[in-house]
Amino acid sequence: MELLDILTAMAKTGRLGPVSIGTDWDEVTAALGEPWDIGTLGHDAEWPRLFAYGDLELSVCQCRRVAFVFVQTWRDTVELPPSVAGGAGVFPGLVSYADVTSALGQADCPWQPNPALTFADQCSLTVTSSGAGFTFEIPEGADPLLNIVDLPGDGHDCAG
């Protein structure tokens, strides 16, 4: 399986393997194992916390539910858990805008530009069915390169 196949399926379905917005944290760790604990996202609070499985990053709220899903794609290689990647889980990074939009089109996954996250050195698009975001860096004199893919939160607020 290729990285774009995984990201396109994630954008189309709103999930990456066992992970989706609202998934119970115990279900995630049962399926993927223990993650790297990056730390807290709050001010002087224990929750919410950011956890990582390679380049898959998950924000988890106080009630232990997945609040946000991010896949960092700006590195030379992108690492995902083998169980969600359908194999080794290591892929070439630095994916072009043209390749992403082509893959979304081939998968019949409609998208639209996201003007709120588009400015001088960055552009972004949103998949209409899931709200998944693809944000690109625009290097000077070069084509846009995929920086991050995210699944947006559902508005849940447990104060943590």
Where in this protein do the model-derived segments appear?
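Short helix/turn-capping signatures at newly exposed starts of structured segments
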Residues: 1-160
